[in-house]
Design a protein with these regions (language model features):
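Start-of-helix register in tetratricopeptide repeats
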Residues: 53, 87-91, 126
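Short coil turns that delineate tetratricopeptide repeat
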Residues: 49, 83, 87, 122-123, ...
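Catalytic-site signature of metal-activated, phosphate-bearing donor transferases
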Residues: 1-73
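TPR-repeat structural position
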Residues: 34, 68, 106-108, 141
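Structural motif corresponding to the intra-repeat A-B loop/turn of tetratricopeptide repeats
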Residues: 65, 103-105, 138
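Tetratricopeptide repeat
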Residues: 35-38, 42-45, 72, 79, ...
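Structural register within alpha-helical repeat arrays
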Residues: 58, 96-98, 131
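Residue at a conserved register position within TPR or TPR-like alpha-solenoid repeats
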Residues: 62, 100-102, 135
């Protein structure tokens, strides 16, 4: 039974009377949360130094706050550190690739990071799609088509798992 500190908490089941509809968070709320999280991380780092587990969280905060240079810096640090972020391993690579694209960085450097992501996560369709988009931009249509076919194959494979 749930209790308040000083009294019993009454719970009611009202399935036909109440409907809760969560619409997500507005951009301003998300940015506020990211700024708050970044501040907490920075305070933690000031107290005990930067640890490898901070890197992915810093990368994520900076990406959401649209500081793409810092996103790249912390994504690269996280990758180099070898930190394991359970359930989010590919997120660091996604943030890195997206940040590089947003900053219109050199396409060959971008392709290098995309290829690294593909080597690390060959089962994921996302990075093949990223590669196809860069190749299309470079007018390398045959190579882009191969990668787009890989995307479709990977999605089909996921559906049959």
């Amino acid at each position: 039974m749930l209790k308040k500190k000083t009294e019993q908490l009454n719970l009611y089941k009202l399935p036909n009377d109440i409907e809760i509809y969560h619409t997500g968070y507005s951009t301003s709320i998300v940015k506020e949360k990211l700024a708050r999280n970044l501040k907490i991380l920075q305070e933690e780092i000031a107290l005990s130094g930067e640890q490898s587990w901070h890197l992915g969280f810093l990368c994520d905060c900076y990406f959401g706050l649209e500081d793409y240079k810092k996103t790249i810096e912390y994504a690269q640090k996280a990758i180099k550190s070898g930190v394991k972020l359970i359930g989010q391993e590919n997120n660091i690579y996604s943030r890195l690739i997206s940040a590089m694209a947003y900053l219109n960085m050199d396409e060959e450097a971008l392709l290098k990071e995309i290829n690294n992501a593909i080597l690390k996560f060959p089962e994921l369709p996302d990075f093949y799609m990223d590669k196809a988009m860069v190749l299309l931009k470079q007018k390398k249509y045959v190579e882009a088509e191969v990668n787009l076919e890989n995307v479709l194959d990977k999605y089909r494979d996921k559906k049959t798992e």
